[in-house]
């Protein structure tokens, strides 16, 4: 307890300062972060301030590695980080909130604070970020007519409930309240969206102010064009722009100045690389080009956020997609200064040298790249085909419907749904099956008749398929959700069979719809079990008409070598001879693999999901083709290597 001698008179202000310091509040109440319009800058505690920040997505990095990545950012000379909060990551079902483990956003922000990093918060509700549906939860689509990112009452009710949960958690973390959050973004690149709904923006401003107060700086970010800023910002929101090395810096900031004649120049997303799509080459930005452009930005006195400073991984099913439909791969490496695995790159050191020209960078050793280990090949054996495993994949039973139901109609938001019916006519001579009146396969469908693979229907390419079978034969269509569109007007991306299926002009009816809980099956039935000998060694049809297999689960185990210090270590898994599917290790969903499409050939395996105390389980769901058959089971292997392959 602070004791002030009564015989020593003190000025009232000095007494309040002592009392405030004793209770830990004085420094908090004096903390300020403001816009200085008169001199085109920020003021932090009354002193001129310029941030050089980097984007990091806690939801793409295991909690185990948060501190390592943040410390590397600090040592690069950054004084702030920028971060999104994806709504769907924290509210997977209406009213079901998750804020623990890898979802503990408050801990992540506190960790940044402890390391001396300020935080630029971007809580959405829409975030883009190449993340499924731009961070909006898929259950919003249960109201099929909903207009997302607008003043649609159904949307606003859901947004209001979410903000009432999230923003009160953020308020104690604001800079003026003793935390690290200096600015908060409202929405995200709203000027790129067709709605241009100012009532929606006003609603958000009102709710942000209600929950966070009037002292925090609220801002917007849009592409550096007048059209985008016209619809993307609003009075009382500070307008910023984003652009990469290919843009003219002067012209980009002239656009900002038309909306913000005074105040700091800000590039909220200065692109260090770019996103990838399956089937396209890996995107890169040359280090020299990036470093030169960063120097020019900083020489103008601009505040800069490097997007991304570390990309991370789209674990599980979290990747987004663009239109025309192009899903993003599991890796979100982004050619960033820190690699997907958190490794230091030439780009990291080049940017650090530039930053050092404008501000002091921390002294001391930079945390090294984490060691990697090649655990070698692991043999896998067949567990069951998807059709054989329906009893455990769909324990609550299927849903009956005259016509196909979408994923959201059966409350299956990610992964896979199996649609089953019977052929209404003889198809001994091949007849085409397709979706009518438009291609309603969302996104990729694996078709079989009486257990014989027929082929693949695809949202973009394979819109019709000839099938064979007798009248009354069982038709199975396994539909994969490959990631929802995260940008543009088509983010209301329904999944499954979203229109009727037709054979020879006959509409197929009387469907049995199986929502597949692959996560529960892997955790409860495959994790920790020995590789199974039941069934055939693979799911291949005996028919020679197709090289495809039935979608099949494969399992295997491997042990961490003994006698080697510091194991387990990070690694990468690759799939020689495999085609496309999903992989889990010890019940953790690493994401999608698709080496036949590329550019990503390996998946990052963080060491925190591995164990030395028991064999490590690998579960693979292969959808198209496995390298092994009954005669060559030794070919059914995956391999752990110490170097990523992305080209």
Curated annotation (Swiss-Prot):
Positions of the pro-segment in this chain: 25-29
Q: What class of enzyme is it?
A: hydrolase
Give me the glycosylation sites of this protein: 27, 248, 500, 504, 510, 544, 557, 617
Q: Where is the signal peptide?
A: 1-24
Gene3D superfamilies cross-referenced by the UniProt entry: Galactose-binding domain-like, Glycosidases
Key words of the record: Disulfide bond, Glycoprotein, Glycosidase, Hydrolase, Lysosome, Signal, Zymogen
Which domain of life does this protein belong to? Eukaryota
Q: What does this protein do?
A: Cleaves beta-linked terminal galactosyl residues from gangliosides, glycoproteins, and glycosaminoglycans.
Name assigned to this protein:
Beta-galactosidase
Organism, scientific name: Mus musculus (Mouse)
The gene coding this protein: Glb1
